[in-house]
Amino acid sequence: MPLDWSRVGAGNKDPLLRPREIYAALPNRPWPYLRHEQGEVLERWFERRTDRDVVIKQNTGGGKTVAGLLIARSTLNEGVGKAVYLAPDTYLARQVRAEADRLGLATTGDPDDLAFRSGQAILVTTFHKLINGKSVFGVTGDGRQAIDLGIVVVDDAHAALATAEGQFRLTVAAGHPAYAKLLALFATDLEQQSPKAWADVRAQDFTAVVRIPFWSWQARQSEVMAALHPHAGDDGIKFEWPLIADVLPLCAATVTSRGVELRPPCLPIAMIPAFDKAARRVYLTATLADDSILVTDLDADPKLVQRPVTPGSASDLGDRMILAPVALNRSLDDEAVRVLARQLADGDRDGDGVPDAPPVNVVVLVPSTRAAAAWAPYADRVHHVRDLEAGVAELKAGHVGLVVMVNKYDGVDLPGDACRVLVLDGVPRPMDATERREAAVLSGSPTLLARQIQRIEQGMGRGVRDSEDHCVVLLLGSDLAVATHDQRQRALLSPATRAQVELSRDIADLIQGEGLDSLRSAIGACLDRDPQWVAASRRALAEIRYADSGVVRPEAVTSRQAFDLAATGRQRDAADAMQRATTEVEDPAVRGLLLEQRAAYLNHVDPAAAQRMLTRALELNQFVLRPAAGVVPAQLRAAAVQAKAAAEFLDQEYADGVSLVLGVKALLDEVVWGDEERSDEAEAAWMRLGLHLGVTSTRPEKLYGTGPDNLWALSDERHAVIELKTGCTTGSIAKSDLDQLGGSVRWDVTNYSGVKSLAVMVHPSAVLHGLGTAVEGMRVVTPQKWEALKKAVTAFAVALADGNGRWRDEQAVAEQLAVGKLLAGSFFQTYAEAPKQAA
């Protein structure tokens, strides 16, 4: 007779709660068992499942998506409430749903689906869908009933947070009626804060950034509200306005020629009650070093964030050989690596034009369209975010060749043959106004360096997706080479990535100074799975363990506390909390920035004390807001002995000769002609160039809001007043630029009595515009002169690196300064030329 299956197992109807058991019971599970690391993570989460915030850290490709889906299903089975799985974008959300289908787990993409509302299916959607001012989940004050959630799983949390920050950042675009109103309202304040930056904004220089002083911003809130509120429903404003309107007085307001950007110090995440009040919040992250952003942006419990859930071993990472060609041999320039990448894509391992190995997919990550242009002669495809999904699908389907991806360093899944060679050609630079201003304020600080290393590690993780995967990673450019060579920067990498970098350095040591053939051989060992390389790679990771505790910076915790106090009107308490934050950091640049924020809170209750505090902030960080009373330029004294000053600076900066050469090359590479977006980096590079050569150098325009881009003290009696126009694309020096240079000379003479000024213009042309008049005695550094200077400075570094610490030896430095014609007294006679009248 037929079996009555309804009676089989009828005595046990309780839903399974342990994620491992849920997986084991799936009828169509793709693998018999979960990977060991996944099982460990799921068991440890289950033990802590009642914690409101849980961070799960695994190496890239460690199976976090499957773990997150099983955790969501477990919470549904337990009856805690509805489950939402958040991906950074729609492309990744579709990938997650496909993974769930493969597992046999019920999901939906529709928040109104009854299966989600009744707790039968996991809602898979984007962070943007939940976090926006018109959220279907409800926004505080919108009159709608917020959706109660049992669990929110945030996949690729650090990438998702970029979306969250964007939703709490309101940009009033140039051309919008409110933009002109805001500029008119604060024009006088902006000009007082930085006359040059304000003039640049009005001249449509999109690199110019100037902050509206917080005391002016707070004093005119009624006018600001009158300018913005009528446009609350406009495109570009309506999704952000409801989230920040209540904290508008606390926002930093930053002006560029492209818009006015309003951004709160921390995200008022309580505006999204579905997330803020969710019973459980799980953050899936890679092994990035700093989790402070989970506290500042999402108000996660810092004590819980500091207790991440991890596997027992960090050896679940795929095999990567990470090489920086320029660190192996200075002659291996970027163009040589581009040719090599093309040959690898074609299977031409030995570079003789005839394929001798299987062709592979080579993926190149670049930060901008401009950077992608250099790859155009070699690329089979160039993808931007809008067409990335189709591009990734094509790579997964088979051999494509060399594929360039523009400004996508996270959230891209390139398993197996989809990517066997990954090239990082630069890292994304700050694009929004607040980030650009913060990057300038924190320039050279350990905090900014840690952020850059985090982005580099994110990029390097794209090419391996599980422990059986393998990939060669090539790092282009000196700045990326420094990241893997400099011990301080390597220490900022996660343990597993650091171990792979250390192993790859052993390979690099074997082929140091050799040419492309040796590099090809090393790459082949990884691609061909040479048993000796594979064994060494696995051995390097075998003993690596995840960190027992997560990194949450103390100042991040107190900054969050201060913001929450300020948002409820307790400004004095907020200022007191920020005082604790400033005592918890050693980096003076960050302390200055924190003091600036403390002054902003204090200004609500004691404006005079706020101005005094801002003066203290300026002593720690010369690039914070200048007090309302202004700043008197500091005395500028030339180095008594140029060679001694240079040797002391180089000794402080560089631990070994390779670091010196790479560091100098990275510095020189920051000067890019014809790219306005790189102007600020060029100005910073010129200042650091002076320090490398033993010349006292500053950036008055950044320090005081007026004066030249660079000021070099060639001697106590003579200054070089330097204006940089590297971003110009004109064939002559404009009258306005000449007038600016003349004004900077007058500023120098006024502020430093008895000094003679040498006017210097860094410009793509030495030809004066017909309407312009040269500043008396001026010199012009043209691209040709710059190339000669680069060659001399590079030779200076190479000569000092060739020996046992010669860069620390004053006599050796003096000799090389003389050989390179880099002495302060004659520097601009050699590496600049006189201006020419237009024909």
Locations of regions flagged by a protein language model:
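Catalytic core segments in nucleotide and nucleic-acid processing enzymes
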Residues: 369, 386-397, 424, 450, ...
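Conserved RecA-like P-loop NTPase helicase motor core
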Residues: 395-482, 728-729, 749, 764
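Conserved RecA-like ASCE ATPase "motif II neighborhood" in helicase/translocase motors
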Residues: 120-156, 160-167, 263-268, 403-413
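Conserved helix-turn-beta segment of the N-terminal RecA-like "Helicase ATP-binding" lobe
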Residues: 90-115, 295-304, 377-383
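Conserved Walker A/P-loop ATP-binding site and its immediately adjacent core
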Residues: 65-107, 129-132, 286-294, 364-372
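Conserved coupling segment at the C-terminus of the helicase ATP-binding
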Residues: 55, 59, 148-151, 156-359, ...
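Inter-Walker segment of RecA-like/P-loop motor cores
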Residues: 94-145, 390-395
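Conserved pre-motif I regulatory segment
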Residues: 2-57
